C-alpha cells in the first residue's frame, strides 16, 4: 500500500492576504484584488475572507462585488510583488524536499518520501511548513496530505483557511465519497450538470456509475473520471525529476472575454514562468500557450524565440501573440457557454 507522502500546499486568498499583510489598514476589512475601484472593467482576481462572507469571489465582475459588499475595498493587482512572494514560498518548500511541483503562483505539490529522517513524518512536515510560512512571511497556507496528488489537492481545500487535512492510506475512496461532485478535480459546472442527469450529486455517486456509461457519455474522459472518483491518480510529483519545461496554469471559474482580465492573467503566468527560469539559472528558447475549454478541446500554439530568455517582458510579449487566436476560439458566446477556460503557459 502506498504511503501518504504527497502534500498539496495552497496559500489562503493569496493576493488579498499579501495586500493585507503589507497594508495594515486593510487587515480585517473586506478587500478585492483586481481593480482600483468598482467602476473599473474586469473581475475580482482574489477576495479576502472578510469579503467572501458577503458572497464575493474570484472571477466575479467588480461591479457585482461592489453591490454585494458596499464596504468593499478595491486594490489593483501587483503581479510582480505576488511573484516575489511566491518565490519565497517555493524556496521554503524546497527546504524539505527537492520534489516540489509548482502548479500555480500560490500552490504546489511536494513528495516528502525520503525526507522523514531529517524532517519527521509527512504530517509533521506539513505542520512545520505552515508554521514557517506564518513565521517568515506572515501568510497562512492550507495543506492536504495523502497518497496521491488528486486526493491531497481535494484535502487542502476542505478546511480553509489555515487548515491541515490528512487522508490515511486506503481511505481515499471513503474520504471522497460524501463530498459534492464539484469538489472533484476537473469537474466544473457543465460536467456536473451532465452528471446530475444520471443522479450524481456526490463523488461516491460518480464512483458507482458503470464504466461503460461514463465512456459513452464522456468519451476518453469517462475512464479518467471513474478513476478520479476512487481517488486513483498515478501522476508523480514532477519536481522529483529534472524539469525540461517550466509551466504555469490558470483556470477561470467563470467565462470571460474581457481582454484586460485575460492580459492580466497572462502577465501573472509570464512572471511565474520567468521567475522560475531565473531561479533555476536557465533560459527558455520556446514559448507555448495551451488553452483547453470545457469540452476538453485543446488548442496549443508555440514559438521559438530568436534568443533564449528569462525575462518576464519577453515571455509576456510572446504569450500574448500566441494566445490571441486561442482565446478567440474559446471565447464564450450565447450559443456556446463554456464551463471554464484553462490557460497554460509553458
Predicted segment positions?
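Hydrophobic alpha-helical segments, chiefly the membrane-spanning helices
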Residues: 340-346
Amino acid at each position: 500500500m502506498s504511503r501518504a507522502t504527497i502534500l498539496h500546499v495552497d496559500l489562503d486568498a493569496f493576493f488579498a492576504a499579501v495586500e493585507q499583510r503589507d497594508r495594515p489598514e486593510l487587515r480585517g476589512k473586506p478587500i478585492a484584488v483586481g481593480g482600483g475601484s468598482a467602476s473599473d472593467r474586469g473581475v475580482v482576481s482574489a477576495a479576502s475572507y472578510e469579503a467572501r462572507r458577503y458572497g464575493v469571489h474570484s472571477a466575479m465582475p467588480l461591479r457585482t462585488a461592489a453591490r454585494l459588499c458596499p464596504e468593499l475595498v478595491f486594490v489593483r493587482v501587483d503581479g510582480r510583488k505576488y511573484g516575489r512572494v511566491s518565490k519565497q514560498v517555493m524556496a521554503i518548500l524546497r527546504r524539505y524536499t527537492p520534489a516540489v511541483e509548482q502548479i500555480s503562483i500560490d500552490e504546489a505539490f511536494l513528495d516528502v518520501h525520503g525526507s522523514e529522517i531529517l524532517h519527521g513524518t509527512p504530517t509533521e512536515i506539513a505542520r512545520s511548513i505552515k508554521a514557517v510560512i506564518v513565521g517568515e512571511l506572515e501568510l497562512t497556507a492550507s495543506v492536504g496530505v495523502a497518497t496521491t496528488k488528486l486526493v491531497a489537492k481535494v484535502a487542502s481545500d476542505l478546511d480553509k483557511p489555515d487548515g491541515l487535512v490528512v487522508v490515511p492510506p486506503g481511505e481515499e475512496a471513503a474520504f471522497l465519497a460524501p463530498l459534492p461532485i464539484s469538489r472533484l478535480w476537473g469537474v466544473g459546472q457543465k460536467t456536473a450538470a451532465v452528471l446530475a442527469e444520471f443522479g450524481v450529486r456526490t463523488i461516491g455517486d460518480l464512483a458507482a456509475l458503470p464504466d461503460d456509461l461514463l465512456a459513452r457519455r464522456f468519451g476518453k474522459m469517462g475512464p479518467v473520471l471513474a478513476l478520479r472518483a476512487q481517488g486513483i491518480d498515478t501522476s508523480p510529483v514532477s519536481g522529483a525529476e529534472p524539469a525540461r519545461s517550466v509551466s504555469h496554469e490558470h483556470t477561470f471559474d467563470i467565462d470571460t472575454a474581457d481582454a484586460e482580465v485575460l492580459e492580466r492573467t497572462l502577465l501573472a503566468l509570464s512572471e511565474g514562468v520567468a521567475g522560475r527560469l531565473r531561479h533555476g539559472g536557465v533560459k527558455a528558447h520556446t514559448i507555448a500557450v495551451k488553452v483547453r475549454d470545457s469540452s476538453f478541446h485543446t488548442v496549443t500554439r508555440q514559438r521559438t524565440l530568436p534568443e533564449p530568455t528569462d525575462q518576464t517582458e519577453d515571455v509576456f510579449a510572446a504569450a500574448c501573440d500566441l494566445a490571441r487566436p486561442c482565446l478567440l476560439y474559446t471565447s464564450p458566446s450565447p450559443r456556446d457557454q463554456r464551463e471554464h477556460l484553462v490557460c497554460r503557459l509553458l
